[in-house]
Amino acid sequence: MPSVFWILFDGGGDRPVGGRTPFHTAFKPTIDYLTSLGSCGILDPIAPGVRPGSDTAHLALFGYDPYKYYTGRGAFEALGAGLELKPGDVAFRTNLATIDDNGMVLDRRAGRYITPEEVEAVENLMANIAEDIKRKYGVEIIYKSTVEHRGVLVLRGSVSHKVSDTDPHKVGAKLLESRPLENSKEAVLTAEVINEVTKRFSEVAKDLEINRKRRLEGRLPINAILLRGGGYMPQIEPVRERYNIKAAAIAGVALIRGVARAVGMDVYTARGLGGTKDDMFDEAVRLAVELMGRYDLVFLHVKGTDSASHDGDFKGKVSVIERLDKALTPYLDKLLNNYVVITSDHATPISIKEHTGESVPILLYGPDVVTDDVSKFSELTCWRGALGRIRGIDVMPILGSYLALTEKFGE
């Protein structure tokens, strides 16, 4: 029985620059060959004009209405980092950042690259802060770094997710204080704890040895931690029960691993798949092809296209697409006997470096899928395809139908 190999270019959708997008520019003979044999269309990850986060977009793509199941990004980040959340836990997504003496954010990613030595120093600092917070407030803190500047912070105790972010979400704005968003003692306590953590981190981090070295090397210091996306673990029916599909996900990013875990997918990672625009995909594709013999659906997440977009790096985005295509080439014969889906979770145009709400291209190839006249995978061409315009939440039912795994509606 054939399986589905689903390739997701995070933030892959784009707007034309000089009449061309990264998908249109990239030399990707394998993807374009599959395109010439399959059905193309355009996909609204959530709905037309809605600017999706990667979390809400992936929930929708995995077949779950984000308006019903989304409880904040932090819980997914924590799951993806390998943490087990207990009932009542509140998790936040974190960024290591750089601020000036007045608390203005200079870089929300502290230059993005964080060495293992720096990660260890930050985790040690957070462990010390956690001890003080536990004594003072009775709230347990668990911090874990994930990829580059990213991390997760879990609060355990009499806490609430009903608090505001400390991340201003833009450079040149002041680091925010968290505020309770409801009149409860749990929300008030949570905001107080977050503000104490934020304050203590900046006070101590500025004098760390790692920052002395970073300054000598001309790198930005790590002197702030930004929190956002507080949430708790939602109750979600596993994808195996909801769609009768046994699924696996391969991802190097904690968020995507977390969403996949939350919906009951088995989660894998692969050498070279670190969640950056420099990732190499040979091992990830090899693993995906191997897993296709054991799963109905194998999902491969490619983060580098989004990272390049946020950096405004057109050539870098093209390079990510081309490296993935090259990794597919040795397995073309295998792919031709199975189903292949290629799409994005949202557009992140190079020109604005942020998520936008336009539709993205989608390809569905399979031995028994109708072939249309589209021969190049791109925003400029896929709209002409036989698949038409669909929503993210439509993808899993469509795949379940081709796999003959979903139940018939009615008699």
Curated annotation (Swiss-Prot):
GO molecular function: metal ion binding; phosphoglycerate mutase activity
Annotated signal peptide: none
Main enzyme class: isomerase
Reaction it catalyzes: (2R)-2-phosphoglycerate = (2R)-3-phosphoglycerate
InterPro entries per UniProt: Alkaline_phosphatase_core_sf, ApgAM_prokaryotes, Metalloenzyme, Pglycerate_mutase_ApgM, Pglycerate_mutase_ApgM_sf
The protein's Enzyme Commission number: 5.4.2.12
Family: Belongs to the BPG-independent phosphoglycerate mutase family. A-PGAM subfamily.
Protein name: 2,3-bisphosphoglycerate-independent phosphoglycerate mutase
Source organism phylogeny: Archaea, Thermoproteota, Thermoprotei, Thermoproteales, Thermoproteaceae
